Amino acid sequence: MVSINEELEVAKAAKAAIKALLPATSKPAVLATLKKANRAAILNLSSGGALNEARGKVGIALSSIMHGLPTKEKIDEAKSAIDAWIKELEGSL
């Protein structure tokens, strides 16, 4: 488990990384950043609330990208999930 501040840093890095990802490409550095974000979101899941819902959505969206070809729809879904995750993390500080 990581602190909220560390999780927020990872979330912001994922937001920057996802912007570099294009449909039908998989860049190793981008995927490594997304994997780290996915891990942080999943490891910090607890019993409920808006933050945990955001973590779950990020986990699903990032897994979809990491385990298949990134499509525009998957990338857009991940961007939206990351934005919601960041918003909830910032609200938890």
Regions found by a protein language model. Give the residues of each.
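Intrinsically disordered, low-complexity segments enriched in Ser/Pro/Gly/Ala and basic residues
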Residues: 2, 25, 45-46, 62-63, ...
